[in-house]
Amino acid sequence: MEMNQKTAFMGINIKDEGPSNVMIIKALNSSSSLLDIPSFMKVAGIEFDPIMFNHFWQVLVDNGDRLPHVGETTLNWLGYEGVFTKQKEKFINMLKRNQISFKELSYQDNEIQLYPSIQKEMLLLPNESAKTKSKWLLMNPDDFKMAIMGLKTKNSEKIKRYYVTLEKTMKLHSEYALYFHDRKAQEEKERERQRAEDEKRSILGEMSEMRQYMQKMGITLEDTREEVKKVNIQNKDIKAQNEEIKAQNEDLAFDLSDVRDRLIEAAEDRSPKLETKPLRERFVIIKRKDSSFPYYAIRGQDVYVKGRLTHFKNTRYPELKIIFDTNYQPNPRNLYIRFKELKDERFIIAGNNIKTVDSSNKLEKEMLELFEKLNEEKHNIYFFFNFNDF
């Protein structure tokens, strides 16, 4: 690396003398905050087409496990004409000719609940029969990029040119961001150096004032040492008193621990069980043969839970198994809400449907342990004491 290059990232060099690109210089001078990509494009004078940009951003950005939906709006943007069904047919034929992968969801797939755009399209269908016959197209970002390169529609050249522009913009923005953070780091170093200098001057000033004061009062260094010895003796006495207080507090803490144990024994009485067993609240997780969401949560009174289990077993899932069951859960809705609020990335939740990020028994066991832990938290009793009150 050359001496005037500070660092390199993705082939981009940061130089001591700063950037040479005029657009990056304009962006750095325009704001003390980091500009996002649309703002950077506007400041740098790069053509910004909000419709084109939004389509690229929504479709080409990787959203993890959820593939982007290629709907009617996207196909219109790509330049396909005619009714939507014909547009999709032409697009899929092009994908097949170029051996580009894609995925289709049907009306029965639970995964459609994750796509608001699909649900909006479903509302426009005339009847239930049309819904059952319809399919919705999904593509991962890399495959969609390949499809763009193979386009031969009225908008294909415009889209390809804008795609190249965006790639150049992304590189420019990355270089701008590196210079921006480097400048912030240098400014922070300068502030730290200035603070250190100010603190040094302050200490030297205080020392000078102290010497002048001691000289004025006739205080010698030996007098100061004697005062320090007296203070040390007083500190030892205070330490001994503190040790005695600490021992008393430990005895008190033991007594409080005994009280806590007694309260925990009574924790079950905080939510007394109903005499009528069918009306007692219950929380159940079943495992079924469903490739999309193998787990399903049922919550409510015992009579309702039994009814749902019987219905599922007789009509849809004869092989279902109960893998988690609370004999008595005073608030099953609260238990399930707390599970969802964890936002644990190992589990995907859609309504009462649950699935793990992979099909391993290990994750299933961890999920059940997590539910058991949340259920046991109903026994927790927390104590907050201020020993100054005793």
From Swiss-Prot:
InterPro entries: DUF3627 (IPR022549), MSV199_dom (IPR018879). Residues 181-263 form a coiled coil. Keywords: Coiled coil. It comes from Invertebrate iridescent virus 6. Pfam families: DUF3627, MSV199. This is Putative MSV199 domain-containing protein 211L.
